[in-house]
């Protein structure tokens, strides 16, 4: 689990310039240095560990968690961790209705699958060069926008967001559907929008990587707990059956 040393080394304590702050984050601020708000890492550590446990427990209950982060500093890191633990993600651009109009998103994913089926069967080679080029360009665009959610069959039970100020459409959709939001909370963000905030820098690459790493580990730990519970339940069932047959 995350330590104070991890937070310091990754620069999690550096907030935004004082003129860009959201006054609602006052309770998370330790002080000011060179017109930069410094986040109170004692509070960050406490919120981090609490939120880690929330995410772990959600995962242990079989709940699905989606990763969202489209800005340049975050998109590749977020994709790397999301793919490594096989959770849905959006790292290029949030399409309006990704959650609130999910059935339409599924139809777009189906278009991507149809194009891939055409490629695999060789059917695409029967088209003219111009038609083939148009379809392949469409496939590239669909994959860029929807590649991370193509295996998502239902809306997620929770979302982990990097930069709630930038991802305001995703946050608004999640709140509308009462989907809990987990997110690092920088000094320019509104804490009222996040169910499980972790006070910290959401711009520095090392900080973003730490957040993604810890949330991924929480999800994996939760899955292990769920498997242990299943094995334990099976053992109990076999024991009961053995006793009843005696």
Swiss-Prot record:
Molecular function as annotated in GO: structural constituent of ribosome
UniProt cross-references to InterPro entries, sorted A to Z: Ribosomal_uS2, Ribosomal_uS2_bac/mit/plastid, Ribosomal_uS2_CS, Ribosomal_uS2_flav_dom_sf
GO biological process: translation
UniProt-listed CDD domains: RPS2
This protein's UniProt keywords: Ribonucleoprotein, Ribosomal protein
CC per GO annotation: cytosolic small ribosomal subunit
NCBIfam families cross-referenced by the UniProt entry: rpsB_bact
Family: Belongs to the universal ribosomal protein uS2 family.
Full protein name: Small ribosomal subunit protein uS2
Organism (species): Helicobacter acinonychis (strain Sheeba)
């Amino acid at each position: 689990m995350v330590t104070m040393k991890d937070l310091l080394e990754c620069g999690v304590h550096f907030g935004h310039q004082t003129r860009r702050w959201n006054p609602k984050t006052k309770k998370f601020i330790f002080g000011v240095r060179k017109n930069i708000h410094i986040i109170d890492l004692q509070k960050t550590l406490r919120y981090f560990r609490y939120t880690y446990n929330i995410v772990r427990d959600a995962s242990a209950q079989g709940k699905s968690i989606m990763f969202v982060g489209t800005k340049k500093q975050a998109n590749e890191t977020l994709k790397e961790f999301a793919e490594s633990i096989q959770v849905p993600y959006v790292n290029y651009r949030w399409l309006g209705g990704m959650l609130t109009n999910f059935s339409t998103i599924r139809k777009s994913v189906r278009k991507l699958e149809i194009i891939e089926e055409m490629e695999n069967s060789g059917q695409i080679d029967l088209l003219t060069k111009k038609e083939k080029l148009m379809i392949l360009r469409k496939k590239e665009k669909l994959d860029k926008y929807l590649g991370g959610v193509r295996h998502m069959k239902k809306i997620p039970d929770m979302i982990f967001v990097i930069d709630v100020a930038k991802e305001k459409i995703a946050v608004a959709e999640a709140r509308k559907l009462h989907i809990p939001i987990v997110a690092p909370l920088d000094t320019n963000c509104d804490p009222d929008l996040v169910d499980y905030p972790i006070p910290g820098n959401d711009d520095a690459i090392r900080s973003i990587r730490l957040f993604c790493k810890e949330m991924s580990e929480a999800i994996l730990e939760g899955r292990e707990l769920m498997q242990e519970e299943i094995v334990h339940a099976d053992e109990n069932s076999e024991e009961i059956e053995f006793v009843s047959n005696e």
